[in-house]
């Protein structure tokens, strides 16, 4: 499967076979790194990393993956990039495309990364937008494949919580594209948009995926192998929305009881991180003092239990991002 010079903007752009090719390559690269026999296939390549939103995992994954493969990466932090402020997206794309072999973008509007791809003349990779998080999806799929013990098209997973944004959208599309049994458990007001749901159903017709959207969290998790969640308040939202979001989502918190409701003693917990699972951060302590919650979207008991595979998931960000870059740029 030839993925040379391909943009990586959203999973909707790819066939199930192409997504599986990325996963297979990521698994190969992971094995090679751990065995100390990694072959550098991106020597002499230069990659620009544009971050309009800050990040730990995405930045580190791109930088380490590039370095492992012999490439150099330039990090453009939020305060350093002029994109859309003093210089148009179109002009930024054309400038960076002359200097770099690929561009990663992490920011707000999906339209921005699509416009970069239109004008850059080099592969563009989506590190996260408000609408989609495709590199996270490869990491999640690889992690589920490693822990499932059966093919992904025989695997069921649920996402519970606020499903309107990049994680809910992307997991729904991922499951549909890979023929999985995917469930969304959320208040209807926090479901993905009608357009995303329609796209998922269209993909499911091709792959045999099963799609369920329900307001009942226990129904969503029944029989699944994996339960995913994400933070209830996104980057940049005001503190005032916390009370409203907690009131809406308190029944979707991942607790030992919700894990048990899966009926699967081997069920695993997944989270793209960072997670509010205790009081050990300033935000976590503020939430406890303000709302009396020790842990928000997931309890400490679940997060730190053997069911939690979030750090396998985080590690796989690097291996799957490396696969995206090697597929596009590798010799």
UniProtKB/Swiss-Prot annotation:
InterPro entries: Asp/Orn_carbamoyltranf_P-bd, Asp/Orn_carbamoylTrfase, Asp/Orn_carbamoylTrfase_sf, Asp_carbamoyltransf_Asp/Orn-bd, Orn/put_carbamltrans, OTCase_ArgI. It catalyses: carbamoyl phosphate + L-ornithine = L-citrulline + phosphate + H(+). Its EC number is 2.1.3.3. GO terms for biological process: arginine biosynthetic process via ornithine; citrulline biosynthetic process; L-arginine biosynthetic process. The gene is argF. Reversibly catalyzes the transfer of the carbamoyl group from carbamoyl phosphate (CP) to the N(epsilon) atom of ornithine (ORN) to produce L-citrulline. Belongs to the aspartate/ornithine carbamoyltransferase superfamily. OTCase family. Carbamoyl phosphate binds at residues 55-58, 82, 106, 133-136, 272-273, 317. The keyword Oxidoreductase does not apply. It is found in: Cytoplasm. L-ornithine binds at residues 166, 230, 234-235. One of its GO terms (cellular component) is cytoplasm. GO terms for molecular function: amino acid binding; ornithine carbamoyltransferase activity. It is an enzyme of class 2 (transferase). Keywords: Amino-acid biosynthesis, Arginine biosynthesis, Cytoplasm, Transferase. NCBIfam families: orni_carb_tr, PRK01713.1. Gene3D superfamilies: Aspartate/ornithine carbamoyltransferase. This is Ornithine carbamoyltransferase. Pathway: Amino-acid biosynthesis; L-arginine biosynthesis; L-arginine from L-ornithine and carbamoyl phosphate: step 1/3.
């Amino acid at each position: 499967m030839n993925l040379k010079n391909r943009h990586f903007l959203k999973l909707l752009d790819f066939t199930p076979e192409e997504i599986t090719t990325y996963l297979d390559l990521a698994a190969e690269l992971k094995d090679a790194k751990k065995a100390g026999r990694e072959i550098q296939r991106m020597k002499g390549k230069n990659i620009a990393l544009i971050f309009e939103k800050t990040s730990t995992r995405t930045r580190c994954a791109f930088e380490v993956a590039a370095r492992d493969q012999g490439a150099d990466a330039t990090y453009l932090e939020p305060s350093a990039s002029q994109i859309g402020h003093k210089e148009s997206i179109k002009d930024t794309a054309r400038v960076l495309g002359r200097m770099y072999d690929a561009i990663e973008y992490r920011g707000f509007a999906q339209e921005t990364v699509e416009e970069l791809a239109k004008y850059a003349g080099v592969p563009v990779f989506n590190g996260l937008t408000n609408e989609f998080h495709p590199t996270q999806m490869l990491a999640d799929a690889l992690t589920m494949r490693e822990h499932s013990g059966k093919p992904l098209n025989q695997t069921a997973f649920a996402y519970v919580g606020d499903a309107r944004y990049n994680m809910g959208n992307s997991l729904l599309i991922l499951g549909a594209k890979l023929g999985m049994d995917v469930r969304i458990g959320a208040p209807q007001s926090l479901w993905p948009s009608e357009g995303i749901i329609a796209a998922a159903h269209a993909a499911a017709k091709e792959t045999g995926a099963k799609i369920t959207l329900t307001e009942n969290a226990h129904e969503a998790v029944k029989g699944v192998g994996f339960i995913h969640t994400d933070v209830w308040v996104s980057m940049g939202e005001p503190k005032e929305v916390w009370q409203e979001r907690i009131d809406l989502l308190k029944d979707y918190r991942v607790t030992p009881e919700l894990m048990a409701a899966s009926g699967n003693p081997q069920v695993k917990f997944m989270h793209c991180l960072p997670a509010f699972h205790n009081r050990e951060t300033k935000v976590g302590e503020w939430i406890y003092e303000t709302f009396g919650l020790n842990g928000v979207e997931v309890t400490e008991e679940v997060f730190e239990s053997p069911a939690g595979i979030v750090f396998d998931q985080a590690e796989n960000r690097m291996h799957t991002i490396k696969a995206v870059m090697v597929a596009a740029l590798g010799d």
